[in-house]
Amino acid sequence: MGVQGLWELLAPVGRRVSVETLANKRLAIDASIWMVQFIKAMRDEKGDMVQNAHLIGFFRRICKLLFLRTKPIFVFDGATPALKRRTVIARRRQRENAQTKIRKTAEKLLLNRLKDIRLKEQAKDIKNQRLKQDDSDRVKKRVSSDSVEDNLRVPVEEDDVGASFFQEEKLDEVSQASLVGETGVDDVVKESVKDDPKGKGVLLDGDDLDNLVQDSSVQGKDYQEKLDEMLAASLAAEEERNFTSKASTSAAAIPSEEDEEEDSDGDEEILLPVMDGNIDPAVLASLPPSMQLDLLAQMREKLMAENRQKYQKVKKAPEKFSELQIEAYLKTVAFRREINEVQRSAGGRAVGGVQTSRIASEANREFIFSSSFAGDKEVLASAREGRNDENQKKTSQQSLPVSVKNASPLKKSDATIELDRDEPKNPDENIEVYIDERGRFRIRNRHMGIQMTRDIQRNLHLMKEKERTASGSMAKNDETFSAWENFPTEDQFLEKSPVEKDVVDLEIQNDDSMLHPPSSIEISFDHDGGGKDLNDEDDMFLQLAAGGPVTISSTENDPKEDTSPWASDSDWEEVPVEQNTSVSKLEANLSNQHIPKDISIAEGVAWEEYSCKNANNSVENDTVTKITKGYLEEEADLQEAIKKSLLELHDKESGDVLEENQSVRVNLVVDKPSEDSLCSRETVGEAEEERFLDEITILKTSGAISEQSNTSVAGNADGQKGITKQFGTHPSSGSNNVSHAVSNKLSKVKSVISPEKALNVASQNRMLSTMAKQHNEEGSESFGGESVKVSAMPIADEEITGFLDEKDNADGESSIMMDDKRDYSRRKIQSLVTESRDPSRNVVRSRIGILHDTDSQNERREENNSNEHTFNIDSSTDFEEKGVPVEFSEANIEEEIRVLDQEFVSLGDEQRKLERNAESVSSEMFAECQELLQIFGIPYIIAPMEAEAQCAFMEQSNLVDGIVTDDSDVFLFGARSVYKNIFDDRKYVETYFMKDIEKELGLSRDKIIRMAMLLGSDYTEGISGIGIVNAIEVVTAFPEEDGLQKFREWVESPDPTILGKTDAKTGSKVKKRGSASVDNKGIISGASTDDTEEIKQIFMDQHRKVSKNWHIPLTFPSEAVISAYLNPQVDLSTEKFSWGKPDLSVLRKLCWEKFNWNGKKTDELLLPVLKEYEKRETQLRIEAFYSFNERFAKIRSKRINKAVKGIGGGLSSDVADHTLQEGPRKRNKKKVAPHETEDNNTSDKDSPIANEKVKNKRKRLEKPSSSRGRGRAQKRGRGRGRVQKDLLELSDGSSDDDDDDDKVVELEAKPANLQKSTRSRNPVMYSAKEDDELDESRSNEGSPSENFEEVDEGRIGNDDSVDASINDCPSEDYIQTGGGFCADEADEIGDAHLEDKATDDYRVIGGGFCVDEDETAEENTMDDDAEILKMESEEQRKKGKRRNEEDASLDENVDIHFGNSSAGGLSAMPFLKRKKRKN
């Protein structure tokens, strides 16, 4: 890094040296910084670092050094000094931040690409659908497939229960088609199945059949009727072969003869007949389990195919589409449950009569969930044994139960469950209660195919009281069976578990494949009561086959009389029933259905919240069963084992990838309900229903509702429509959620909710296995008192998950719809969703999830004993807000693709930039580079600490002749000769000599160290707010050894103007006069102590306000930093270095292995290098000797000029002037505004320091006012050189009072061309009388015959004459012009007190290379006496002839050194030749 801004300050003293002059020089190469340059700069077109970039860079630079015949010595960094370690740590932190940004950028890139792919797929689908529709329309005109459609369609809305399932004529057609199905037509069907993008090989709608016929070009109209029959059979056969592993639930019946035939031969396929009626469940139950499984799978697939056909017809009607999706989804869920039960029956796994299943653990470990009670268990069991024996005898063994998966007991305090023993008996054969081999009560609900088990002996105390209360209300219900009854109230529950309430979170796993059976804990639940339900299991199967959902209501007819309490110990699942004969009754009894959810160990108790109008009817029972300590310990042990198993499952599933299908996830987590609202049922009116639908559940047409969605539509006896919300718990574990349990099962959607108000939630079967993952949070947004966090995940579409903190109101009520605060929350959520779906502001985000959570940390939930509720909706498509189209048009898609492409380009650029910053140098890179140096025969040294310090020591010990580095710290360590930019593709190299810096800038090593402490370097952070200009001024104003300490004291001292000191006004006056002195005259050098104090006071006054913005570190000024620069740790060995010869064969091998270069390419680089390296001597061109004098920059800042001139004391001021005159110059034609001249005159008069010298000048000038104004105008223009091509501005990071003082360093690329002007020039008299001539020329300012000829750029006037005297020094007038440093014009009249002395060093370093001729003439006049100058000026005015005076001057000055030439330089000859030609 070096010292900030130091290179810019040193640029004016730098020279461009021909690279040929480096021959045979021993150069110390600081190679440590090379490594960083190579790994950051050498990149391929993709932004990745070039392989072995460090070796390639070293190889090329070594070749150039050898080609120049230098003798390089490479120096590498060693250990990092303690002071520098801080900076290294900061840089490492920046790299780590860059790496973090790289990961985020990579995620954005991936998301961008996935979105792009998705958009292209959508565009392609739109195009294909249009083409397909056109083809279908054309084929329909030629092909009649009505019979095929009628035969292949499975009716789902058929209300006639008594319709026959099959007919003899249909069986004959199927039998005939099955024979034909083995022919070549099967290949056509296979090809169609293969081409299906969804992997579904079912083509049942007429359009698809028409496409099949069209693709079979060999078919003709004559065979059309026969082909239809063949397709009907072959489709069924092919479908069953390809999808036997897919779960389905339907019912079908075929003749028993065919059953036996298929069962005996497993290789044959079961051909499903075409059905016009429903299936007889008795026939289905009599079949073997394997055959039931096959038939159900076939039925499910056919139903899915028919659904797709229906979707196409209603795809443009969102309401109908959603209703169709809901109906289809509910049927497929029921089918899947039946398949799961059949699968378990076929497996036959049981231990001791108890069904076993594997939970999240090892593959060969299974758990049997049971509990053993001490003491009262036998007594309690015997009390119920006699009563349940009778029910067990009545149990039918033809049911197909489905076990509840993933049920968990309470951790410490289970909520009690009380069941009704004395309730009115409505015997139903479908509900059976029995005792298994272990003496456990079990209940079977054959309607649902659900078997729920749980130990309830501990709850018998509460049952008696609850039964008496519930029996009255249960007697009123003749149509429904209450699936849950008589649960404890909240008061009793709180008595039971005052400390902690954990979650019983159940979820029925969604298994689309029969090959992957679910693994779960089976929990048995007893029930000895029943209600009126459907007559028999046949009716249930009829409803399933007909497509109608089955409803088992858990409420009474009138919600006002609802007194059934409940508790969260168990989760129940209900499926709506489509009862064809009594739909109106079912409508009045629709209610909330609760579903099992995933196990959540660390969550609070799962509460189900209802609001009822008669909450006071809740049963008040203080009887609580006492739980023994042994039971609690056993439960805790079991809970721990389950938790470990779940953690293992989470680890295994953490790498699972989300499917392509998207889902919309809405999780609403609410605080625990209050006592008043515990058993309340919240029914929302019609108006609130619309608002709820608009805000939460408006989904696109192809959506899928989650199993965690607990929203259902309820209707009361009065016909009032409402929405009842039910909440479970959001899983606390971070594992993936398979959220497909649906409690929103509607018996007749159209009969309950109008299409306009329908819940637009539907499903696609391919979406059912979507895994919901929560990924890293990226941002948060706060509104109100709630926090919203948004997270992005690298999937096909973006998922946004928001967390909103919701708090209970003052009364503890957690009613969602009645709480204004939560209404506000939902409105915020809705606005967030709307923004994310806005195509103009955001790309397609079809994965949007909004999760409302009171606390995302499980530990906080346990500590706060919060009971939270989750409302979760998963959908496969986007939200469809009002005004947002369902489908993007092609124009919108193209626009989105264009935006994504632009974003991809910008993100790629950002990633490449971050990758550059993230790369670091390794030790292996250094080792490889050092090995390369050995092959070339080049010595190298590893410094103990800093490579720059070692290079400086080697130069001081005369081990090397110069140092090649780009780090300005080398000057602080004591370097004398530094070469920079040696590897640029130019013929020169920049050189910096410390002697030039000391003489021309007045900056010694100590002063540069002080500036480094002000500006900041590798060892110190510097002072915030101080730039290069202020640093020079500080060093100038505080030149003492302890100047920096005094500077700190001054900055920290109070402002004297605030204290109201008497000298404050005087100080401001001194500021004005002193600043004018320094600004205009700049004569700080050689000043006395009083002058130094005055300069310091001027600095303080000018920077008092600015200093308030300077932030000084606590350790400033640090002696440790100064010591580290003055006494660095280096290798003190002075042993001479030796160089070897490059090994060509080894280099060729290395190039082949590392760079993949062939021998030809290697030789092209190495052979010229070796040839040049072996040369003994070379003949240099003459230009090489003069190129040292080429200056390439000059300062254009008044403030830098002023500070530099006075930075080194009396004698250093002259040397500083040398710096200011360096650089080729030419005078620009410049017009000075009148007010500028007046300002300059005024500044001269106000200057206290310059008054005395100005008076002396006035003695030599007859017309001081006008001529001086003219002279100032002319001199002001001379600050610019002839060629101004490259301008480098020195920016001062600090704020200062001189805002208009721009610091510019002018770089001149071709100074040699400045000497080739072909314009005519007037002769100049080179004599001591030049001052008089100058005065006269100034006096004749406006005369046409004035001696001074004003020229434009590129032309030199007669006052630009060159003085040829050997003993002449540069004039102070030129100093004041700054050699381009823009000094004030008043200083351009030379002082007579300057010494008449010229040094050889000045000529050697190229002093006066581009000095204007008139200024050199002025330098002569300054050495003469004032009286002589006056006499000569009078004589000059009398003669009026300048040519004779020029001749005399040429005669007197035999030895001429032109100001525009170097010491004996070739560039001076054109001027000499022109002068002679003019004579």
UniProtKB/Swiss-Prot annotation:
<dbReference type="GO" id="GO:0005634">
    <property type="term" value="C:nucleus"/>
</dbReference>
<dbReference type="InterPro" id="IPR006086">
    <property type="entry name" value="XPG-I_dom"/>
</dbReference>
<comment type="function">
    <text>Putative single-stranded DNA endonuclease involved in nucleotide excision repair (NER) of UV- and oxidative damaged DNA. May make the 3'-incision step in NER. Seems to play a role in senescence program.</text>
</comment>
<dbReference type="InterPro" id="IPR019974">
    <property type="entry name" value="XPG_CS"/>
</dbReference>
<feature type="compositionally biased region" description="Acidic residues">
    <location>
        <begin position="1294"/>
        <end position="1303"/>
    </location>
</feature>
<feature type="region of interest" description="N-domain">
    <location>
        <begin position="1"/>
        <end position="98"/>
    </location>
</feature>
<dbReference type="InterPro" id="IPR006084">
    <property type="entry name" value="XPG/Rad2"/>
</dbReference>
<feature type="binding site">
    <location>
        <position position="969"/>
    </location>
    <ligand>
        <name>Mg(2+) 2</name>
    </ligand>
</feature>
<keyword id="KW-0227">DNA damage</keyword>
<feature type="compositionally biased region" description="Basic and acidic residues">
    <location>
        <begin position="1215"/>
        <end position="1225"/>
    </location>
</feature>
<dbReference type="InterPro" id="IPR008918">
    <property type="entry name" value="HhH2"/>
</dbReference>
<keyword id="KW-0460">Magnesium</keyword>
<protein>
    <recommendedName>
        <fullName>DNA repair protein UVH3</fullName>
        <ecNumber>3.1.-.-</ecNumber>
    </recommendedName>
</protein>
<keyword id="KW-0234">DNA repair</keyword>
<feature type="compositionally biased region" description="Basic and acidic residues">
    <location>
        <begin position="854"/>
        <end position="866"/>
    </location>
</feature>
<dbReference type="GO" id="GO:0009408">
    <property type="term" value="P:response to heat"/>
</dbReference>
<keyword id="KW-0255">Endonuclease</keyword>
<feature type="compositionally biased region" description="Acidic residues">
    <location>
        <begin position="256"/>
        <end position="266"/>
    </location>
</feature>
<dbReference type="InterPro" id="IPR036279">
    <property type="entry name" value="5-3_exonuclease_C_sf"/>
</dbReference>
<feature type="region of interest" description="Disordered">
    <location>
        <begin position="854"/>
        <end position="877"/>
    </location>
</feature>
<feature type="region of interest" description="Disordered">
    <location>
        <begin position="128"/>
        <end position="150"/>
    </location>
</feature>
<dbReference type="InterPro" id="IPR001044">
    <property type="entry name" value="XPG/Rad2_eukaryotes"/>
</dbReference>
<feature type="binding site">
    <location>
        <position position="946"/>
    </location>
    <ligand>
        <name>Mg(2+) 1</name>
    </ligand>
</feature>
<feature type="binding site">
    <location>
        <position position="77"/>
    </location>
    <ligand>
        <name>Mg(2+) 1</name>
    </ligand>
</feature>
<feature type="region of interest" description="I-domain">
    <location>
        <begin position="934"/>
        <end position="1022"/>
    </location>
</feature>
<keyword id="KW-0378">Hydrolase</keyword>
<feature type="binding site">
    <location>
        <position position="1018"/>
    </location>
    <ligand>
        <name>Mg(2+) 2</name>
    </ligand>
</feature>
<feature type="compositionally biased region" description="Basic and acidic residues">
    <location>
        <begin position="384"/>
        <end position="393"/>
    </location>
</feature>
<feature type="binding site">
    <location>
        <position position="30"/>
    </location>
    <ligand>
        <name>Mg(2+) 1</name>
    </ligand>
</feature>
<feature type="region of interest" description="Disordered">
    <location>
        <begin position="384"/>
        <end position="425"/>
    </location>
</feature>
<comment type="similarity">
    <text>Belongs to the XPG/RAD2 endonuclease family. XPG subfamily.</text>
</comment>
<feature type="region of interest" description="Disordered">
    <location>
        <begin position="1418"/>
        <end position="1479"/>
    </location>
</feature>
<feature type="compositionally biased region" description="Basic residues">
    <location>
        <begin position="1269"/>
        <end position="1282"/>
    </location>
</feature>
<dbReference type="InterPro" id="IPR006085">
    <property type="entry name" value="XPG_DNA_repair_N"/>
</dbReference>
<keyword id="KW-0539">Nucleus</keyword>
<feature type="region of interest" description="Disordered">
    <location>
        <begin position="548"/>
        <end position="579"/>
    </location>
</feature>
<dbReference type="GO" id="GO:0006289">
    <property type="term" value="P:nucleotide-excision repair"/>
</dbReference>
<feature type="region of interest" description="Disordered">
    <location>
        <begin position="239"/>
        <end position="266"/>
    </location>
</feature>
<dbReference type="GO" id="GO:0046872">
    <property type="term" value="F:metal ion binding"/>
</dbReference>
<dbReference type="GO" id="GO:0004520">
    <property type="term" value="F:DNA endonuclease activity"/>
</dbReference>
<keyword id="KW-0540">Nuclease</keyword>
<dbReference type="InterPro" id="IPR029060">
    <property type="entry name" value="PIN-like_dom_sf"/>
</dbReference>
